[in-house]
Amino acid sequence: MRPMTLFESGESNGKISLGNLFTTPEKILEKNELKLQDIAFLICRGGWPMAVGLPEEAALEQAFDYYDAVTKEDITKVDGVKRASERVQRLMRAYARHQGTQASVTTLKADLKNNDTAALDDDTISSYLEALRKIFVVEDMPAWNPNLRSKTAIRTADTRYFVDPSIATAALGLGPADLMNDLKTMGFFFEAMCVRDLRVFAEALNGKVYHYRDKSGLECDAVIHLRNGQYGLIEVKLGGETLIKEGVETLTALSDQIDTTRMKAPAFKMILTATGEHAYRRLEDGIYIVPIGCLKQ
């Protein structure tokens, strides 16, 4: 059972259907009601059913309670192997700092060495990560491997994600105010929240979510690939003209590289945002700009 999406918890109005975007509608125009402060709170609250509807302070405590339960109880219950809660906490903090990247075990080990008093060896890190996967705390995203016009080498490493962004904020001791004071960091956690929701929506459409990155550094945050071969390219941005322009450039560059003689062209290209007054389709290139507060499956 996955955490709830913003549509399931009632924060997204659901005016834009991800499934409908695969039909490439000519025009969309819907109002978004969520502000950046709302998004910061929802990242830290998470999609935990018991947190929905509670007063803000009590709702935020649910993620910390979950984090404590994972590190002190659940991590041992999964296979009966005793694991030190303090070690689990240190690893989860390192994982949180590298969420949304293709960080290797070696990278996580170096992070632990730089940020904590004692490092863990490779086998211990791998063992702990496997236990966290079994209790559905982390869920890495596989790489997408399309047919390209060029011989560009595609990175095949999985991308690191918790199943809910609030696990990462709890591990690092962050709250909504911390995110509002550091929008760059907030962008990484917002991406994780979007991935959480997209995974639920994709499963409802008989699809999966992938990540694309190649040797040149071209990267696409999410690719929704359906069983029938249709797919959509998605960039995640907090919002604002500059970031949206970056997203447009990325989506256009990747789309131009795809060899459409060997596979379908993307059914849609979308920039999923935290802010913005409306969901709409750009006339010049057909890219959809959709606030997360408007999206459903």
Each language-model region and where it sits:
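Arginine/glycine-rich "motif VI" loop of SF2 helicases in the C-terminal RecA-like domain
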Residues: E203-A204, T252-A265
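Active-site-adjacent loop/helix micro-motif of nuclease/hydrolase catalytic cores
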Residues: G240-L251
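Domain-level recognition of nuclease-like catalytic cores that cleave nucleotide substrates
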Residues: A274-Q297
